[in-house]
């Protein structure tokens, strides 16, 4: 028993050390990407700032694209998103699930803004960033499909709307561009964005005037 306990302790210690190293690499990448841009930053610079070797950086993230992907994943699918998904998972009504897409969208973009605002501004025209963003857009659309399927299965979709059109509208209305234009460019509070989006989704996609 004592031997097994020591092995578990060593395993836990190694896991914690690996997580700390990963965090240092990601923080170094975020700092340098934000100030120099993605394309101008090198793996050697990231390794130096993180206090690790270049092979260690490659072992953790494989490449700059892998590092960027990890940063965006952690920011977008962080605590805010997980809490929103938990709330969504507890709702069975198909129309209300559509409305709650506004809460999920706000959680995603608030998390992204808090963690990656400088990076997004400095690297807005990076081909690598555009490629990663597109992969997340595809994932976002795929994750929304279940809500659309449930809406049509419950026969509560807006009359004349096809399932594919509904999926496209949900994806478009909950996009980063809409959030950015309303919150960052027009000065809306995130609460106002969420309230507007809830009502817009209900009016656009369903036959129900749900409040």
State what each model feature region is.
Residues 24, 28-36, 84-87, 169, ...:
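Solvent-exposed, amphipathic alpha-helical segments
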Residues 60, 108, 172-173:
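Conserved catalytic core of Hanks-type protein kinase domains
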Residues 1-66:
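Basic, helix-initiating cap at the start of DNA-binding domains
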Residues 69-101:
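Amphipathic alpha-helical linker/stalk segments
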Residues 63, 112, 125-126, 176:
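Short loop-to-helix capping motifs
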Residues 152-200, 208-211:
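Hydrophobic/aromatic-rich alpha-helical bundle segments in the mid-to-C-terminal region
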Residues 103, 107-120, 128-154, 164-168, ...:
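Amphipathic alpha-helical packing segments from all-alpha helical-bundle domains
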Residues 60-61, 70, 196:
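Residues in the recognition helix of alpha-helical DNA-binding motifs
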């Amino acid at each position: 028993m004592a031997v097994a306990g020591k092995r578990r302790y060593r395993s836990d210690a190694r896991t914690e050390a690996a997580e700390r190293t990963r965090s240092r690499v990601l923080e170094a990448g975020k700092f340098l990407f934000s100030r120099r841009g993605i394309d101008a930053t090198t793996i050697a610079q990231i390794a130096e700032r993180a206090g690790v070797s270049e092979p260690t950086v490659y072992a953790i993230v494989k490449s700059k694209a892998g590092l960027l992907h990890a940063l965006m994943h952690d920011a977008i699918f962080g605590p805010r998103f997980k809490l929103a998904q938990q709330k969504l998972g507890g709702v069975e009504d198909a129309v209300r699930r559509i409305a709650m897409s506004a809460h999920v969208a706000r959680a995603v973009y608030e998390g992204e803004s808090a963690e990656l605002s400088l990076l997004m501004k400095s690297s807005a025209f990076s081909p690598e960033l555009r490629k990663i963003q597109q992969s997340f857009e595809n994932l976002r659309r795929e994750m929304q499909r279940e809500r659309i399927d449930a809406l049509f299965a419950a026969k509560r979709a807006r009359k004349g709307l096809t399932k594919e059109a509904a999926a496209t509208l949900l994806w478009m209305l909950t996009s980063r561009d809409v959030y950015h234009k309303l919150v960052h460019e027009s000065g809306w509070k995130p609460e106002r964005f969420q309230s507007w989006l809830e009502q817009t989704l209900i009016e656009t996609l369903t036959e129900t005037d749900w409040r």
